[in-house]
From Swiss-Prot:
The keyword Signal does not apply. Catalyzes a proton abstraction reaction that results in 2,5-elimination of pyruvate from 2-succinyl-5-enolpyruvyl-6-hydroxy-3-cyclohexene-1-carboxylate (SEPHCHC) and the formation of 2-succinyl-6-hydroxy-2,4-cyclohexadiene-1-carboxylate (SHCHC). GO terms for molecular function: 2-succinyl-6-hydroxy-2,4-cyclohexadiene-1-carboxylate synthase activity. GO terms for biological process: menaquinone biosynthetic process. The gene is menH. This is 2-succinyl-6-hydroxy-2,4-cyclohexadiene-1-carboxylate synthase. Belongs to the AB hydrolase superfamily. MenH family.
Length: 272
């Protein structure tokens, strides 16, 4: 059984859940990140116990690998089981959001209470687009394997999806992510390429648990995606693609509002 490295956060002592094993918040980070990225938001959601997971090739899971989305979903299920988590809300950002959607749609997700996705791509609708993305991701992976990591990261954060970042913010991210291992990042990037990901929208629309889509108001690509596919969208002010980093207070408030609202919904109202 493969289990991912993770960190547990207990609820605040004054929380009514402190003495009870209620639903957990399980957090999945993006490419180049770690579970620690979620710490500010998780602490602000301190009425709930949290599990901050390091995905394969990242953080304390750097020595672990994954053979695609189904394998990562299995690792996630095994990690939850090993930590005694029976009921949980699953939240994911970017790559973590894509993994979260896949797990909710196709994985062993007994006990899943709901889904929170930040800037996660639903996939590509045709083979031509998937093949082009595979080629693009292979080129990035080759750079992560062969070139100095700060040099690759500097170019990585010049991509259009990070257009809201100013030079100082880009420099901070390059420094923050420079402790990654290029070979491990390359392997994970290829294993989870959008070219390998199934088109998730139809399965997402059939979910029988509530879900929401969170997006920074400056993240034009994913705002358009959410609007195009009529996802249940909540926007975060003064934030781009990484909204939980830019505005953790507003992000946590949206999470708590969604959990509160969803916990009161009758089964017939779920997901909408």
């Amino acid at each position: 059984m493969t289990t991912l490295a993770c960190r547990k956060l207990a609820p605040h002592p004054e929380s009514p859940r402190h003495q009870h094993a209620g639903p957990w918040l399980v957090w999945l980070h993006g490419l180049l990140g770690s579970g620690q990225d979620w710490l500010p938001v998780a602490q602000l959601c301190g009425d709930y116990p949290s599990l901050l997971i390091d995905l394969p090739g990242h953080g304390q899971s750097v020595s672990l690998s994954a053979d695609g989305f189904a394998d990562i979903s299995r690792q996630l299920s095994q990690t939850l089981q090993a930590n005694g988590i029976r009921e949980y809300w699953l939240a994911g950002y970017s790559l973590g959001g894509r993994i979260a959607i896949y797990h909710a749609c196709y994985g062993r997700h007994h006990g899943l209470q709901g889904l929170l996705v930040e800037g996660g791509n639903l996939g590509l609708e045709n083979a031509e687009l998937r093949q082009a993305r595979l080629q693009q991701d292979r080129q990035w992976a080759q750079r992560f394997r062969q070139e100095p990591l700060p040099q690759v990261l500097d170019d990585w954060y010049q991509q259009a999806v990070f257009a809201d970042l100013d030079p100082q913010q880009r420099e901070q991210l390059v420094l923050l992510r420079a402790d990654n291992h290029g070979l491990a990042v390359a392997e994970m990037l290829e294993a989870t390429s959008l070219g390998h990901q199934p088109w998730l929208l139809p399965a997402l629309q059939r979910l029988n648990v509530p879900y929401t889509y969170l997006c920074g108001d400056r993240d034009h690509k994913f705002l358009q995606l959410a609007q195009q596919y009529r996802l249940p969208l909540h926007t975060l002010a003064r934030a781009g693609h990484n909204a939980h980093r830019a505005n953790p207070g507003a992000f946590a408030a949206q999470v708590l509002a969604f959990l509160s609202q969803s916990s009161c919904l009758p089964p017939s109202s779920l997901s909408r």
